[in-house]
């Protein structure tokens, strides 16, 4: 979404009591770093070992799961003011499939398995759902944990208006 939009989004989410880093300063000119950038208040926590931390017992894991689920549910229910909607591109299943077909057509060779998968996706498209704000990369590596609790959700550069099942899918992917 670009750093300016990400900065504005973090300000908005912080005002709604989301567990995100507090944005402090936007340097559009790149005076401080040589490139446009923004600064945030440090959020205590680490994303390492969320799934494998031996210090987390079953009750800790249940509470952490509740914390994460609460934040994600709150995000997907959030009403975005019209002046904030301009920050986001709308995405949907069809636009993703179209983009994949376009990329596939640019290749100098064919990939029949990918073509088959795209046809399957077209035929088995999920039921249309209401669109909501999505993180776009909701996974363990973007969740900060400290003292067995969720302290922050970071890396909002892929945020968009889309199907909330995208975030759930990212979170459930075994590769994280």
Q: What would you call each of these model-derived segments?
A:
Residues 1-95, 99-117, 124-130:
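ATP-binding pocket architecture of kinase catalytic cores
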Residues 14, 49, 143-145, 163, ...:
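Short, function-defining helix-loop hinge/capping sites that tune catalysis or transport
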Residues 23, 75, 119-166:
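Active-site acidic catalytic loop and adjacent metal/ATP-binding pocket
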């Amino acid at each position: 979404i670009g750093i300016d939009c990400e900065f504005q989004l973090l300000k908005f989410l912080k005002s709604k009591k989301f567990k995100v880093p507090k944005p402090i300063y936007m340097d559009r000119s790149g005076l401080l770093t040589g490139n446009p950038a923004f600064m945030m208040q440090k959020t205590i926590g680490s994303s390492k070992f969320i799934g494998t931390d031996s210090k987390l017992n079953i009750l800790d894991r249940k509470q952490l799961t509740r914390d994460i689920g609460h934040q994600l549910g709150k995000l997907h229910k959030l009403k975005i003011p019209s002046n904030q909607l301009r920050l986001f591109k709308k995405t949907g299943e069809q636009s993703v499939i179209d983009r994949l077909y376009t990329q596939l057509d640019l290749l100098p060779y064919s990939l029949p398995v990918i073509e088959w998968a795209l046809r399957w996706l077209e035929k088995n498209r999920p039921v249309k759902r209401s669109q909501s704000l999505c993180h776009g990369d909701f996974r363990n590596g973007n969740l900060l944990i400290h003292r067995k609790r969720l302290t922050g959700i970071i890396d909002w550069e892929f945020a968009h208006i889309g199907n909330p099942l995208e975030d759930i899918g990212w979170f459930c992917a075994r590769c994280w």
